[in-house]
């Protein structure tokens, strides 16, 4: 169901690692096929007049064959989600390539539906290609099969595309959460396993029950929303936070720094408040040591979790698209979310913090709500 062939034109094929990395962020790359002259002609013909590349982009150069992780049996909404995921991957790849060059139409073309993907493979000039790809699709399904009975899928629309998450019925632990990573995302699996092990003593880190070669099993937590004040208009899933939650996150970041670690993608979207276990940070894929960048950790007040990576280093990591991170390392520390500047969060609570926090959060809420209504009105007036 999730098989797709991306066609990369000459303009965007050097370096080829860039479009491949964009596609691999959300889909499993199965095969990369550099086209010979007859293959380029055949692929251009298969694309058809309405989907050929503009002259500035050049002729088809390379096929990148990719696949989404096969859906869980009985998932009636899988086809819609897979199509939306492939569209999102294509848009992410386009934006990635536009960073360094002027935009020229869409930078890739891609097939829609498995039949179209197989048709494209048939014209690539490699008689064994189709069989190799189908074998790898089957292997991908086997590797990414959740190893315990699934109660229901969780986080199906996550923009990360690196793992599947399910509520499962474990034979020993009962209801628990299994997160299984696809083969192309093993770096993220290793990061998360390392973080859950190194930070197991931290109250905000979910309890790791067990793990396998590419999966993690954690305690199931419910969410009563106690850490939330209100959702921010225009930022789906990002809520303003209560002061106790923000202080707990600032302390968590301080602990990370003391252990030579920093974290990106610390967002309100990744938080739950369990009535018994308290506040938890669900996603730890972007916990990393400073030594990865061969740098001496900065002073605690300048920790990257608070302040973000230096610009000269940010290009060395495929960062998630993070909202509300201008001037801060993570959105939980943005004034629109926390209500206080990071300097105030890192110091002891002071008189006047409460009214200032409330006023700042309300100000941001009103500004974003007004801006959203204005944007809608302007669109309707066109």
Show where each model-derived region lies:
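Conserved structural core of kinase catalytic domains
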Residues: 204-246
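A conserved alpha-helical element in kinase catalytic cores
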Residues: 179-212, 240, 244
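Catalytic-loop of the protein kinase fold
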Residues: 257-268, 273
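Conserved hydrophobic alpha-helix
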Residues: 252-256
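ATP-binding glycine-rich loop module of kinase domains
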Residues: 155, 161-193
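Non-catalytic terminal and connector segments of soluble metabolic enzymes
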Residues: 1-151, 158
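C-lobe/activation-segment region of protein kinase-like
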Residues: 274-378
């Amino acid at each position: 169901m999730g098989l797709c062939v991306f066609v990369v034109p000459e303009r965007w094929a050097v370096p080829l690692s860039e479009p491949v990395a964009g596609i691999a962020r959300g889909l499993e790359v199965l095969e990369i096929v550099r086209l010979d002259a007859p293959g380029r002609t055949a692929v251009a013909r298969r694309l058809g007049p309405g989907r050929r590349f503009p002259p500035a982009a050049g002729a088809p150069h390379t096929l990148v064959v990719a696949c989404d992780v096969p859906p869980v049996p009985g998932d009636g909404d899988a086809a819609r989600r897979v199509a939306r995921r492939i569209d999102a991957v294509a848009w992410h790849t386009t934006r990635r390539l536009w960073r360094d060059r002027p935009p020229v139409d869409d930078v890739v073309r891609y097939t829609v539906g498995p039949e179209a993907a197989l048709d494209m493979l048939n014209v690539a000039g490699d008689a064994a290609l189709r069989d190799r790809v189908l074998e790898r699709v089957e292997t991908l399904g086997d590797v990414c099969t959740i190893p315990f009975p699934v109660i229901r899928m969780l986080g199906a629309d996550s923009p990360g595309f690196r793992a599947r998450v399910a509520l499962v019925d474990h034979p020993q632990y009962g209801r628990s959460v299994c997160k299984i990573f696809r083969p192309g995302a093993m770096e993220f699996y290793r990061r998360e396993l390392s973080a859950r092990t190194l930070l197991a003593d931290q109250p905000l880190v979910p309890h790791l029950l067990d793990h396998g070669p590419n999966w993690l099993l954690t305690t199931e937590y419910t969410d009563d929303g106690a850490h939330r004040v209100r959702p921010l208009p225009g930022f789906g899933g990002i809520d303003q936070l209560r002061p106790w939650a923000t202080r707990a996150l600032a302390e968590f970041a301080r602990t990370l720094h003391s252990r030579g670690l920093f974290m990106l993608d610390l967002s309100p979207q990744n938080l739950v408040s369990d009535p018994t276990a308290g506040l938890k940070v669900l996603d730890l894929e972007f916990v990393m040591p400073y030594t990865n960048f061969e740098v001496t950790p900065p002073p605690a007040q300048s920790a990257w979790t608070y302040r973000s990576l230096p610009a000269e280093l940010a290009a060395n990591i495929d960062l998630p698209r993070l909202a509300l991170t201008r001037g801060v390392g993570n959105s939980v520390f943005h004034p629109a979310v926390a209500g206080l500047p990071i300097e105030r969060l890192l110091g002891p609570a002071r008189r006047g913090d409460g009214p200032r926090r409330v006023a700042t959060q309300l100000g941001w809420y009103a500004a974003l709500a007004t801006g959203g209504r204005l944007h809608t009105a302007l669109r309707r007036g066109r």
